[in-house]
């Protein structure tokens, strides 16, 4: 669910790689890079691996394919688990993103496509977010549905752009 590698010049590349259900990609499936508990654990493990690698100076997060950085949490996974599991899933995801945010190495989110919902929350945990022109939508659509972003996205957004801009 996460491809991890280190380039010759010390960049740890963490590539999110899943279909719309959050399952591993198979032939013919579109990479939407939604995350499940398993992927979030893989992200957490990759972040820790990069942190402890003295040869790594930069961590770069990206999504597999050209259309999505990440479409956020897998709705099918969230629909199939208990409220208690959802609570601990969101808690672990928030802890993982906080760990990413507090990593003393430079963290770059390379937005290669849409970054919505939890996908944007992952990107906001990076030090720098970059994307190509017209690469896709960026937003927290759950807020317009009256749902609080599950991994601290509203708080991260207001810290990044200020409260007034975040309210827009």
Pin down the residues of each PLM region.
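Glycine- (often His-adjacent) and acidic-residue-rich active-site loop
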Residues: 18-23, 27-30, 63-96, 146
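Hydrophobic/aromatic residues within transmembrane alpha-helices
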Residues: 43, 61, 74, 122-124
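Structured loop/turn residues at beta-strand edges in well-structured enzyme cores
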Residues: 9, 54-56, 73, 102, ...
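Crotonase-fold acyl-CoA enzyme core
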Residues: 101-168
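An acidic, glycine-rich surface segment that forms the CoA-thioester-binding/catalytic face
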Residues: 40-44, 51-52, 75-112
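Conserved CoA-thioester-binding segment of acyl-CoA-metabolizing enzymes
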Residues: 1-62, 98
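Short beta-strand/turn micro-motifs composed of small residues
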Residues: 62-63, 111
